[in-house]
């Protein structure tokens, strides 16, 4: 196996024996084949006659589900993934009967996928990253992976929107186009870069789509005090990103006496009016995803994993974990739909918290709607000099010690700077008491990783107010990355022409030196420095210049 799609990949170069995420070579091979089959299906779907629009839409749905299933820490169940792979292939083959006779097909559209698991895994090894590096070179393969990971992130966000009945034909069409491009080995670096930039455009549309889906379904987030700890009583913990799962669980637990807590990136749920209206949405438990193996042991009730990030469960709590939708781990109880009766039964049978715990509070819900409602006051504060700078510190969190940099840079920023945060990277700064500038908190939690759209909307609005461009604003972006949704967000920012992004804690292993030179030359992307102090001095010097 060779997998280097996440920031924690082994030695910063790639996992070759077993994933740092605990993904096995078997699962890695099947996931590689899911990408290969998705590319073949996408090619076929793009060649269908105009009369086959329904089939093309279904193909996009299957590709979205397949891509999301291969995102880091989503599904580790080889049986489930194999079944999904065969479904892709069977649908691909059914669609080929609708093609004109003169259509030439690439190998990904014709390959006969073995129905024997051992042989199937060997096939996966033949069409994975390592084999393409040998035949296409590291730069072309690296760009293919950059494109693939951007589309994986897109697929995750598009899937969340789709479960709320929101689709965008432009998003679907690009996913088919982008995946089909992976079958064309004649594309050189410049041609692939062009597709990657189109992926950035489609990524931005996907972020906008999910924002519309969430706010139309649950209302615009509003600033909300969230208790960051538990209270006495029976309890259910919900992790992941799926707000519809949260809504349905809250509805089904009404009047049961059970308290529902958010975990990880579900924290922003508290800011949505249609979720916060439930009084038994009692607070938040724990920190970022990578702490779950310690935190879940001490949670006295069932745990629902709605999306990533799932880690290998410890035996002490594995029997209390329920997976939903595309999430999977062998042996865990999977819920095929939003009937949470088993979870509720488990909560009622569990001890629950025996006493209230003293805990701090955190204000969530500073989405773009709330911030832009105060735009005049913000612009006035900038003009008066009360606010000198904005700095976005957020993204994905992870376990590396170097990530304390993100805490340091927020804590040591000048007192007249506003800190924007989002994603699970927020847990690097939520413990900080940064105070206020006038009536505005210096720390504004804008939501989940997909709520990068809110940060972009605010930046674009400020640029318009000052009759300038985003790169001329008093704004710095310091992004932490971990998995493929962060790649989607990064490509969206590059599509908008945003420059000078600091990325860390390390640069992606799939970015080759030649690719990095292109990103630096065109977008001034830079790795985070040796220390927060050094980078702050560099930012201040650039402001003064």
UniProtKB/Swiss-Prot annotation:
Positions that bind hybrid [4Fe-2O-2S] cluster: 241, 265, 309, 396, 424, 449, 483, 485
Keyword annotations of the record: 4Fe-4S, Cytoplasm, Iron, Iron-sulfur, Metal-binding, Oxidoreductase
Cofactor binding comment, as recorded: Binds 1 [4Fe-4S] cluster. Binds 1 hybrid [4Fe-2O-2S] cluster.
Cofactor(s) required for function per UniProt: [4Fe-4S] cluster; hybrid [4Fe-2O-2S] cluster
Predominant localisation class: cytoplasm
An MF annotation (GO) of this entry: hydroxylamine reductase activity
EC number, as in UniProt: 1.7.99.1
Pfam families linked: Prismane
Cysteine persulfide sites (modified residues): 396
GO biological process: response to hydrogen peroxide
One cellular component term from this protein's GO annotations in UniProt: cytoplasm
Reaction equations catalysed: A + NH4(+) + H2O = hydroxylamine + AH2 + H(+)
Binding residues for [4Fe-4S] cluster: 3, 6, 15, 21
Subcellular location: Cytoplasm
Record InterPro entries: HCP/CODH (IPR004137), Hydroxylam_reduct (IPR010048), Prismane-like_a/b-sand (IPR016099), Prismane-like_sf (IPR011254), Prismane_a-bundle (IPR016100)
Family matches, as NCBIfam families: hybrid_clust (TIGR01703), PRK05290.1 (NF003658)
Family matches, as PANTHER family: HYDROXYLAMINE REDUCTASE (PTHR30109:SF0)
Function: Catalyzes the reduction of hydroxylamine to form NH(3) and H(2)O.
HAMAP family (alphabetical): Hydroxylam_reduct (MF_00069)
Family that this chain belongs to: Belongs to the HCP family.
Protein name: Hydroxylamine reductase
Gene name of the record: hcp
